[in-house]
């Protein structure tokens, strides 16, 4: 029996990363972006392009537009806070579906860095006070970019 394991690593050298970030809830999304940029810097990523969009709903179409521009991976960042209407559920559902669809159709890792929160306190704690999910999402972005590079180099069955 021949067993081979493929996994990405956290070396950012030579990676070209795109980040699509929502301006809605910008106090929080900016913290996510700071965390992501900190991670990219610490891991040696030299090229990061940031695309700002009005809200999370605009993220999937922007990701689709830039997916063919030679990026190794794309990180989508946003914060959705549940309100008293169904808007939260509708947006969260469509954004997650859209991001997954683009990733599958284009064959590029698109990392879902959208923080869903029940309230503002939870959103704040996930966006930089207790922990910064932006850093974690960026680490996943690096790992997946490297895994896809390895898969592209290996044509074995």
Curated annotation (Swiss-Prot):
Transmembrane segments: none annotated. It is an enzyme of class 2 (transferase). The active site is at residue 87. It catalyses: (2S)-2-hydroxy-3-oxobutyl phosphate + 5-amino-6-(D-ribitylamino)uracil = 6,7-dimethyl-8-(1-D-ribityl)lumazine + phosphate + 2 H2O + H(+). CDD domains: Lumazine_synthase-I. GO terms for biological process: riboflavin biosynthetic process. GO terms for molecular function: 6,7-dimethyl-8-ribityllumazine synthase activity. Pathway: Cofactor biosynthesis; riboflavin biosynthesis; riboflavin from 2-hydroxy-3-oxobutyl phosphate and 5-amino-6-(D-ribitylamino)uracil: step 1/2. (2S)-2-hydroxy-3-oxobutyl phosphate binds at residues 84-85, 126. Its EC number is 2.5.1.78. 5-amino-6-(D-ribitylamino)uracil binds at residues 24, 56-58, 79-81, 112. Keywords: Riboflavin biosynthesis, Transferase. Pfam families: DMRL_synthase. GO terms for cellular component: riboflavin synthase complex. Catalyzes the formation of 6,7-dimethyl-8-ribityllumazine by condensation of 5-amino-6-(D-ribitylamino)uracil with 3,4-dihydroxy-2-butanone 4-phosphate. This is the penultimate step in the biosynthesis of riboflavin. Belongs to the DMRL synthase family. This is 6,7-dimethyl-8-ribityllumazine synthase. The gene is ribH.
């Amino acid at each position: 029996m021949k067993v081979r394991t493929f996994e990405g690593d956290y070396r950012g050298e030579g990676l070209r990363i795109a980040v699509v970030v929502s301006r809605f809830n910008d106090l929080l999304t900016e913290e996510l972006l700071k965390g992501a940029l900190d991670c990219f810097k610490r891991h040696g990523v030299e090229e990061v392009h940031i695309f700002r969009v009005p809200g999370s709903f605009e993220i999937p179409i922007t990701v689709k537009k830039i997916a063919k521009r030679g990026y190794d991976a794309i990180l989508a960042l946003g914060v959705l806070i549940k309100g008293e209407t169904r808007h939260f559920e509708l947006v969260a559902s469509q954004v997650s579906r859209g991001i997954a669809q683009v990733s599958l159709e284009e064959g590029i890792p698109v990392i879902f860095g959208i923080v869903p929160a029940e309230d503002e306190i939870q959103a704040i704690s996930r966006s930089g006070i207790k922990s910064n999910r932006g850093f974690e999402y960026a680490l996943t972005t690096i790992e997946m970019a490297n895994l896809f590079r390895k898969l592209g180099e290996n044509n074995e069955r």
